[in-house]
Design a protein with these regions (language model features):
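N-terminal positively charged helical leader segments and presequences
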Residues: 1-63, 161
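RNA substrate-binding interface of SAM-dependent RNA methyltransferases
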Residues: 8, 15-18, 40-41, 74-75, ...
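Structural motif
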Residues: 24-29, 71, 92-93
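Short, acidic/turn-prone active-site loops that include or flank metal/cofactor-
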Residues: 27-29, 51-53, 75, 120-122, ...
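Short, glycine/polar-rich helix-capping loops at beta-to-alpha or helix-loop-helix junctions
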Residues: 31-35, 122-129, 191-197
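Glycine-rich phosphate-binding loops that contact phosphosugars or nucleotide phosphates
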Residues: 68
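Active-site/ligand-binding-proximal alpha/beta "capping" segment
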Residues: 163-210
């Protein structure tokens, strides 16, 4: 099980059936009354807690006072690929929880069928990741596989083209052929994709227009 905090993350966990228990302060129960009400419909136990207890549970300076205990929702890369996905995000060696959550949220927003964290990465089920994902962690399949080569093998055996994001990519995003099932490789915050770019079918640059 994992403990998450915050309105969006807890709301998503409750509405998708991932939450088993919710812990809430008196003020938070009033502020997030709609979530407390939803717990009743979803058979989620609601436990009142003190502000002091909330501070101990929280990993932020200012606690929202709203927490949920959730069942693990981590998929396997194989299970995601078994669904014959058309679009998959593959963050590689992601070390920052906030970035991991943002990648999950962005993947959810762009209609991806799954996210596979490849290599030694941050725990995608962590509280900070869940909060940064703004609830998307419970809306899209998320997997973690420490073997990057194995992940690439699964992608290719499923017939997906593998594209690498690169600032000096030879193809502009607007010109890339995205008509076939596609997996996007996203590099580490500090070192990018490095030599892993050579494993991709194409290196694509995403211009920042502004």
């Amino acid at each position: 099980t994992v403990i998450i905090e915050g309105e969006n993350a807890v709301d998503a966990a409750v509405s998708t059936g991932a939450a088993t228990d919710v812990f809430v302060t008196e003020k938070a129960a009033e502020r997030f009354a709609h979530i407390v009400t939803a717990c009743g419909y979803m058979d989620v136990y609601v436990h009142p807690i003190t502000d002091k207890a909330a501070k101990h549970l929280s990993d932020t300076a200012t606690s929202t006072g709203l927490f949920a205990v959730c069942r693990p929702v981590l998929w396997t890369a194989g299970k995601i690929m078994a669904g014959k996905p058309k679009l998959v995000s593959v963050p590689v060696l992601t070390s920052e929880p906030g970035n991991a959550g943002t990648l999950i949220r962005t993947s959810d927003a762009m209609g991806a069928d799954g996210v596979i964290f490849a290599g030694e990465t941050v725990d995608p089920l962590g509280c900070k990741v869940a909060r940064a994902s703004a609830g998307s962690l419970f809306h899209i399949p998320v997997a973690r596989d420490p073997n990057i080569k194995d992940v690439l093998g699964k992608l290719r055996s499923s017939g997906m083209q593998v594209l690498a994001t690169a600032a000096d990519g030879e193809v502009d995003l607007a010109d890339a052929d995205l008509s076939q099932p596609t997996a996007w490789l996203f590099g580490n915050e500090a070192h990018g994709l490095g030599d892993l770019q050579d494993e991709a079918d194409m290196r694509v640059r995403i211009p920042i227009l502004g």
